[in-house]
């Protein structure tokens, strides 16, 4: 990726957006990765070396990481976090399951639209 592509990529993945109009917001971030002693590995924020284009996880924080290299050879670490979940109206917040991102993320559950209409 050239500099413009990286900026465009950052603008897209760092944008906060609403999913389904139900109050679920999501964000991802990208940061320049540190230099590992093995030039083919990316130094992750966990302090360990990781292969390019392979995912690793922090299950305690419910995060997924990916290391990639741009066209100029600069390594970046992409960090995917759980969406911010806000339950509004008849919707409820359901905790995530244990395990890797995104399964460990909480989710907003809402009754089906036809069930809501029958209540009126």
Curated annotation (Swiss-Prot):
It comes from the Eukaryota. Residues 1-26 form the signal peptide. Contains 4 disulfide bonds. Keywords: Disulfide bond, Secreted, Signal, Toxin. Expressed by the venom gland. InterPro entries: SVWC_dom (IPR029277). It is found in: Secreted. Coiled coil: none annotated. GO terms for cellular component: extracellular region. This is U-scoloptoxin(16)-Er3a.
